[in-house]
Regions:
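Mid-sequence helix-capping/hinge segment at a functional interface
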Residues: 1, 37-38, 104-155
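Short beta-strand->alpha-helix linker/helix-N-cap micro-motif
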Residues: 1-78, 83-100, 124-138
Length: 168
């Protein structure tokens, strides 16, 4: 699939899931912080660290693994919620976007399904969540640029972050 969309999907999921009162979302910043702890602990900087180990390091009970498939429409977005201790799947969900412009709406539907699947107590509250395309943006390129900005900022690259934020 189009790998430039992966960051956009995860950024959109983070924005959507942060609306939950019952889920404690650590987000990309915590992930990058945990990853940095591995790299400063004498590990090779180019070392690939499994997401499960990073989730353990930051104290997460569960973590998300998501991807988007399809180099062109239709796009399939899949999301697994995994138990940090056992790596067992707590939920495995999928949404389809018929065209690129529909990806933010598909992310919103997927986040709503994740919240319900994880037992968010009030289905009404989940349904009242502000869709990504209204809360932030309906533009996938803007989501991707924002994700690049967040990643650059967390890596200490402020000039790159500013450029990416301006593009978003």
């Amino acid at each position: 699939g189009d790998k430039t969309l992966d960051g956009a999907v995860m950024q959109g999921m983070e924005m959507e899931l942060s609306q939950s009162d019952s889920l404690k979302l650590l987000g990309g910043e915590a992930y990058l912080s945990g990853l940095q702890q591995f790299r400063t602990g004498g590990s090779d900087a180019s070392l690939t660290v499994p997401a499960q180990r990073v989730a353990e390091k930051v104290g997460a009970k569960a973590y998300l693994y998501g991807e988007i498939r399809g180099a062109k429409a239709p796009y399939t977005i899949s999301m697994d919620v995994l138990n940090t201790n056992t790596n067992d799947k707590l939920a495995s969900l999928e949404e389809t976007a018929e065209k690129r412009e529909d990806i933010p709406a598909a992310i919103s539907r997927l986040a709503q399904s994740v919240r319900i699947e994880l037992g968010e107590s009030s289905r009404d509250h989940v349904r009242k969540a502000v869709p990504l395309q209204q809360d932030a943006t309906g533009n996938v390129e803007a989501l991707h640029a924002y994700w690049l900005g967040e990643t650059a900022m967390q890596g200490g690259h402020r000039a790159e972050a500013l450029t990416a934020y301006q593009q978003a």
